[in-house]
Amino acid sequence: MVIEHIRNFSIIAHIDHGKSTLADRLLEFTGTVSSREKQDQFLDKMDLERERGITIKAQTVRLNYRADDGKDYVLNLIDTPGHVDFTYEVSRSLTACEGGLLVVDASQGVEAQTLANVYLALDANLEVFVVLNKIDLPAAEPERVKAEIEEIIGLDTHDAVLASAKEGIGTKDILEEIVKKIPPPQGDPAKPLKALLFDSWYDQYQGVIILVRIVDGVVKKGDKIQLMSNKKTHEVLKAGVFSPEMRETQQLCAGEVGFIIAGIREVADAKVGDTVTLLHNPCDAALAGYKEVKPMVFSGLYPIDTSQYEQLRDALAKLKLNDSSFSYDPETSLALGFGFRCGFLGLLHMEIIQERLEREFNLELITTAPTVVYRVHGTDGSLTTIQSANQLPPTQEIAYVEEPFILASIHVPNDFVGGILALCEEKRGVQREIKYLTPTRVMVVYELPLNEVVLDFYDRLKSITKGYASLDYELLDYRQSELVRLNIMINGEVVDALSLIIHKDKAYYRGRELVSKMKELIPRQMFEIAIQAAVGTKVIARETVKAMRKDVLAKCYGGDITRKRKLLEKQKEGKKRMKNVGNVELPQEAFLAILKVEG
């Protein structure tokens, strides 16, 4: 294959702007998928991806296309995830390309995630051209959207392709533009092997399959390869391309995109962004830009039925095979029993994993409120990182606590700006800028503490804006904050599963809210129950569940007052004794409802 005839490209789009449908049309037009195999969203392999209309893992497919100039080209489509939690994966997938199609819905215009990914593409020096999709819709306004793209992103749109992936309009024009506008890859097959690993997944028969873009050199069956980040070596068992099913080839040359199977046992060994080279003839330096992905959001997962603990453990291990950015450790809670503390890249990642556990493995789970990673500076000069309230040391041992801040850009129609500003202020945000992108769309940029965002920010954002807002965020830094641990106590006993780390100013309101909610949920007992919210030793809110009372005087008709008093005293004694020995069982529904309040 002549390197001048290869084009590597990806499609950049916001969720629901028609990326997967467009990919389907390209597959059909080039005859890669016959109409018999055709199904919607061919590249989205997981049911969950199809259903939620999002791409979670990167996929690649090779298209053979004879252009109008009579030459045969190989087009490698690298399908990238479009969601904010997977930014690092996107940046690596984009590095494997030379160009990109920016797909924008002609009726909706530019959204926050689109922007984030376009900037990633431009940073990677990709040649980006614009495709306006869904032009068949009555609401489509191509001229307005073109002006918006030029204004916001600064891309030239005078020759943007007008298309409708659903109707198949403009598919040929897009393919011609790819051939004309996107440069061929640069690379030298004679140099030592240097390849970028941009995705990997686990296959139960063949071990880990890695997707690579060969930068220099050649790789073939039987070669001994080495991963540069951990220096592990493997022998290549198969190498090939997806067209769109796996097809083994003689070799993969510079400029090509394909897969390698090399008997790698764990996905954790095949890290996205790593450089693959040959053991006996290594390249001199690894590719730039590799970094370890660290979980940002943590949550406890507990099976509702404790007998499902083993199942949950096996299910988590299986998911971990395919997703090295996800982490889990066993933990126990007095209230919820045995479970796991899981780490995720962000909120969407957390939702996806939870949903996959429930759907693919039939587990019923309780999840505790999500938390972030805090840095605790001790009075003795030590620094520890914690993920849950139960790990926070006593107040007297803490010098100060730092929490992560993010830079959030929110795109929203101008009617809702007031509500968004109020929400960000309530969440302790610091305003950076407000920019009118068009007379009707506004970009609001705020610095926000991540722990305020993980609870219910996204849901509130959507409900304030009737679903029209889009959010993108990046991690900024850690900042010192006045954070305290809020404990919920029942009859003086702390319920560990309900403890949370919260800002001092909000502790009272959250405590008030939680105890009043619990008062409704805890069933009455024969003795009274005190529910308290406390910060340190100071109780800041209290509710009491009154005792049920048996009428012990019912059988005394008339009679002496001392007789009645004796019975009442006896009842009082009994209740006192009961209160000392009786413990309150919290019903499961109470937990679920309380965890909802925490949002």
Swiss-Prot record:
Single GO molecular function: translation elongation factor activity
UniProt xrefs under CDD domains: EF4_II, EF4_III, LepA, lepA_C
Biological process per Gene Ontology, one example term: positive regulation of translation
Topology with respect to the bilayer: Peripheral membrane protein
Residues reported in the UniProt entry to bind GTP: D16, H17, G18, K19, S20, T21, N133, K134, I135, D136
Annotated keywords: Cell inner membrane, Cell membrane, GTP-binding, Hydrolase, Membrane, Nucleotide-binding, Protein biosynthesis
Intracellular or extracellular location(s): Cell inner membrane
Domain of life of the native organism: Bacteria
EC assignment: 3.6.5.n1
InterPro entries per UniProt: EF-4 (IPR006297), EFG_III/V (IPR035647), EFG_V-like (IPR000640), EFTu-like_2 (IPR004161), G_TR_CS (IPR031157), LepA_C_sf (IPR038363), LepA_CTD (IPR013842), LepA_IV (IPR035654)
Any Pfam family matching the protein: EFG_C
Domain tr-type G as annotated: residue spans: 4-186
Database matches in Gene3D superfamilies: 3.30.70.240, Elongation factor 4, C-terminal domain, Elongation Factor G (Translational Gtpase), domain 3, P-loop containing nucleotide triphosphate hydrolases, Translation factors
CC terms in the record's Gene Ontology section: plasma membrane
Reactions listed under catalytic activity: GTP + H2O = GDP + phosphate + H(+)
NCBIfam families in UniProt: lepA, small_GTP
Homology family: Belongs to the TRAFAC class translation factor GTPase superfamily. Classic translation factor GTPase family. LepA subfamily.
Protein's name according to its UniProt entry: Elongation factor 4
